[in-house]
Amino acid sequence: MGILVKGEITITKGFKTWKEMVYAQDGKLKEHGIKFIFAGTQKDDPSKLHTVMQFPNMEAIQAFRDDKELTEKRKEAGAVIESAVMTPISDEYFTNYPN
C-alpha cells in the first residue's frame, strides 16, 4: 500500500500555479512513485498548502527530497522549500470511510 505522508508547505504564487506545476511534473512524480491523495490550501490562509501523499517506500521519500530538478520547479511555482514539513503516517490508518 505504501507510506502515507502528511505535508505542509508555504506557497507564494497561489494554488493554481502550484497545481499546474504538479501536473507538468507528472512524469517526474511517477518516476518517484508519488501519488497525491489530497492537496489543498488552508481556508483561512491560502498560502498554507496541505497535502497527503503516498510513496512506495522511505527511499522514494528521500529521492523526492533530494531531486534538485523537481525542487527547482517547486520553487519556481512558489513553494517555500525551507518551510516544508513532511510527517510519515503510521501503518495504522484508514481512508475513504465510509466508502
Predicted feature locations:
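Short S/T/G/P-rich N-terminal loop/turn motif that feeds into the first structured element of a domain
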Residues: 1-71, 82-99
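Short arginine-rich
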Residues: 71-77
